[in-house]
């Protein structure tokens, strides 16, 4: 889709789903993966798209999500190691979905 990643780390699964909805409705981005930590009390969303869409999506989620993100960022043209890390997380995410 694109060659940039946007990251949002936000407290709670419900707030994360709200942030993802905002990001996907705001710009042409897709969910690459997500990670739940601390029993779901902290959720990291990773979206993918071109740099302008990812930036717009992350900014919109930070401004309008149910809860304030703990952290956020955009990586334009991420290093190959970052891509590998996101792809590894995405493969675990897809495997869990296939088991359900």
Across the structure, where does each feature detected by a protein language model lie?
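A short beta-turn/loop motif at secondary-structure boundaries
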Residues: 36-39
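A common structural junction motif
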Residues: 27-30, 61-70
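Short glycine-/aliphatic-rich beta-strand segments at the starts of folded cytosolic domains
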Residues: 1-11
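Short amphipathic alpha-helix segments
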Residues: 13-28
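Short, low-order "capping/linker" segments at domain edges
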Residues: 81-100
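Metallocofactor- and cofactor-centric catalytic cores in central/energy metabolism, strongly enriched
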Residues: 72-82
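Helix N-cap motif at beta-to-alpha junctions
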Residues: 48-54
